[in-house]
Amino acid sequence: MSSQSLYKVSGNIAANALVNNDQYKKMYQESIVNPEGFWREHGKRIDWIKPYTKIKKTSFDDHNLSINWFYDGTLNASANCLDRHLAEHSDRVAIIWEGDNASEQRKITYGELHTQVCKFANALRSQGVRRGDIVTIYMPMVPEAAVAMLACARIGAVHSVVFGGFSPDSIASRVIDGKSKVVITADEGMRGGRAIPLKRNIDDALKHPDVTSVEKVIVLKRTGGKVDWVEGRDVWWHSLVETASEHCAIEEMGAEDPLFLLYTSGSTGNPKGVLHTTGGYMVYASMTHEYVFDYKPGEIYWCTADVGWITGHSYMVYGPLANGATVLIHEGIPNHPSPARLGEMIDRHKVNILYTAPTLIRALMAEGKQHFDKYDGSSLRIMGSVGEPINPEAWRWYHEVIGHEHCPIVDTWWQTETGGILITPLPGATDTKPGSATRPFFGVQPALVDNMGNILEGATEGNLVLLDSWPGQMRTVYGDHERFVLTYFKTFRGMYFTGDGARRDEDGYYWITGRVDDVINVSGHRLGTAEVESALVSHELVAEAAVVGYPHDIKGQGIYAYVTLTRGTEESEELRQELRQWVRKEIGALATPDLIQWATGLPKTRSGKIMRRFLRKIAANEVTNLGDASTLADPAVIETLIETRLNRNE
């Protein structure tokens, strides 16, 4: 193996880990050669009401697409996260919660969480929620967010969690698409010392003329902030659960019945509702949580992701709770009120496993390691990275400053669509290289292909595809199965196309190189460029807009917008700021352009197609080798854009 920047597994970790390298190779080989036998055995890790006898019916043929796992079994996801632990671990702490203000803290045992979920599940039923109904959840990072999700799962309702940073328009589009009957929110959330007006955002979203399905809005009293009230529609969480029974029978769900919807950005502009089902997802979320983080019973596990993203679903709620872990949930951001907050929380709660994003690591790096002078960190055993590729400098800083050079780092690659981690080191099995996601998890068959779909062997670079299904895979785009087939299975026939590019080195390790479609990754969160462009051109003074990602020291990728104004409109810094606020209002703060360059024209082919590769290079300040411009209708546009670019290094 290439020794360049290689961090070898320590003997102590390998000796005590769930799997060492030899075991990984043996298990991986079995999972590929005999997937039915492998998953028949590992599917038993969760509790089934009616045990499965049929394991796998899958095909990536775009004319005959089929993704079915454990498909004759029945189960309940809520029971797997709660009821199964009550006999032996009712008093174990399930959730440790720390508020935005560190003085606010709560601990909830598995027994208490079970009671809260049962009461709220009965409350949902009292509001007319039935099996198969879609419930929109727009909540702060409080334990009640997990309670709401698990209560939906308990009664067979399908939850659709919307990130608390999204705007009313973004909420409305998701409510309309899912035809939600009930919305669950809070008066306000707290983040970084600021109150977030969640209820007000919901009120504004539900004023959209196309929102016609919502009958009830359940409101958690988090801050006591003033809220407007719609009589007959709005109801307080606490008034519902006060009288609700503590006993709630579980709904028996088929393995392929929907568990949740989660909307993710697409390259076409409209967010797509990723649909995950119950059986395969629960098997995969719990198995990856245990093996990737080498989880040991009773350990304290902290995933810093928001519940509104897939990481919060799989590795803050379903995976860890299915495994009986103690989960730390933090309402705020781990560098507020100072960069020392992350270390203080690790020490205060004796965290054993930390799962966070490169964006946070880079932000802490920029502040300096002096903020960790008082940090002990002796409880920490495993550290993970998620959301985007981590650059080697940030990896090393994370390893040295947070991990004190004794914690393995699992740099995980996966997607909303995959349900769980696909490419990752395993702590006791994988020597790591900073910046590499390394090797596939059990049952995962990655490959690299050229643009014609030919599989590339050996050390090479190409489009990252997957050759066969795994249990956690999404099943469809809600209400638009054709879009599912078109997006993931038409580009390369018989393969799942991830939308990412990757490099494979001489040791077979994978290095993710970033999106190859029109999606950008901002602070580990995916945004469709078409979504941002649509918001910009909806402003009356914007004639045309093109949006690309560019390298950003903190966020990984920033948002760079080229904007052509309507004839006669004057360019100004005031208008630039107005457009930034406009996008913020239309989509949310996450989508706010970092840089807006005025463009008298955009590079287009004679057929009118915008040549984004030129725009990406100019935004990245890579202007010396732009490549062939002969297909452009007006090559002079390029020179003008280069001269007026904003991201100069000089």
From Swiss-Prot:
Entry protein name: Acetyl-coenzyme A synthetase
Organism: Shewanella sp. (strain MR-7)
PTM section of the record: Acetylated. Deacetylation by the SIR2-homolog deacetylase activates the enzyme.
Signal peptide location: none
Stated role: Catalyzes the conversion of acetate into acetyl-CoA (AcCoA), an essential intermediate at the junction of anabolic and catabolic pathways. AcsA undergoes a two-step reaction. In the first half reaction, AcsA combines acetate with ATP to form acetyl-adenylate (AcAMP) intermediate. In the second half reaction, it can then transfer the acetyl group from AcAMP to the sulfhydryl group of CoA, forming the product AcCoA.
Cofactor: Mg(2+)
Matches recorded under HAMAP family: Ac_CoA_synth
GO molecular function terms listed in the Swiss-Prot or TrEMBL record: acetate-CoA ligase activity; AMP binding; ATP binding; metal ion binding
Annotated positions binding Mg(2+): 537, 539, 542
Catalytic activity: acetate + ATP + CoA = acetyl-CoA + AMP + diphosphate
Modified positions (N6-acetyllysine) in chain numbering: 609
Keywords: Acetylation, ATP-binding, Ligase, Magnesium, Metal-binding, Nucleotide-binding
Family designation: Belongs to the ATP-dependent AMP-binding enzyme family.
Gene Ontology CC, one term: cytosol
E.C. code: 6.2.1.1
One of the protein's GO biological processes: acetyl-CoA biosynthetic process from acetate
Binding site for ATP: 387-389, 411-416, 500, 515, 526
Gene3D superfamilies noted in UniProt: 3.30.300.30, N-terminal domain of ligase-like
Matches recorded under CDD domains: ACS
